[in-house]
């Protein structure tokens, strides 16, 4: 009975540190909790064989590593061998560069304050409050400025799309003539 209480006390005092160790071993927090629970269950069965309880953390970490390795080996591979390799399209960075160039060009139509808000909120992924603090304005001002800036960007993109379609139509007509 004393061993059970000793193990319970150990788990109670070391649980957070052990969970941090488990989270370093597996990327998903839920899997980390499962890993720790499995390791604790396995360790509980052998608790009395650990003579120096000061080494219990090391023992438990080794159990977690071994358990993770077992899980990794037991996983089902989703790759299925076939006789022919599937055709996979190559990613073309040219389109990405064109999109980025278009976006940089379209941003020029915005006022400097609007451009700053858009860049901080969407590229730097700052929160509304962080953007407000960085620019020295209220959160409400950030929201309204962002709303107006995005509306202006949409208008500009639609206008450019219409211009591009008109140019394509003219080019087709010229080639057909």
UniProtKB/Swiss-Prot annotation:
Coiled coil: none
One Gene Ontology term, aspect cellular component: cytoplasm
Pfam family for this entry, one: Sigma70_r2
Induction cue: By CseB, in response to cell envelope stress.
PROSITE patterns: SIGMA70_ECF (PS01063)
GO BP annotation list: DNA-templated transcription initiation; regulation of DNA-templated transcription; response to stress
GO MF annotations, alphabetized: DNA binding; sigma factor activity
Annotation: DNA-binding region: 128-147
Keyword hit for DNA-binding: yes
Superkingdom of the source species: Bacteria
Nucleotide-binding as UniProt keyword: no
Keywords on record: Cytoplasm, DNA-binding, Sigma factor, Transcription, Transcription regulation
Record-linked InterPro entries: RNA_pol_sigma-70-like, RNA_pol_sigma-70_dom, RNA_pol_sigma-E_actinobac, RNA_pol_sigma70_ECF_CS, RNA_pol_sigma70_r2, RNA_pol_sigma70_r4_t2, RNA_pol_sigma_r2, RNA_pol_sigma_r3/r4-like
Extent of motif Polymerase core binding: 34-47
Main location: cytoplasm
Cell location: Cytoplasm
Functional note: Sigma factors are initiation factors that promote the attachment of RNA polymerase to specific initiation sites and are then released. This sigma factor is required for normal cell wall integrity; it is recruited by RNA polymerase to transcribe genes with cell wall-related functions. It is also involved in the transcription of the dagA gene coding for an extracellular agar-degrading enzyme.
Protein family: Belongs to the sigma-70 factor family. ECF subfamily.
Protein name: RNA polymerase sigma-E factor
Species this protein is from: Streptomyces coelicolor (strain ATCC BAA-471 / A3(2) / M145)
Record lineage: Bacteria, Bacillati, Actinomycetota, Actinomycetes, Kitasatosporales
Name of encoding gene: sigE
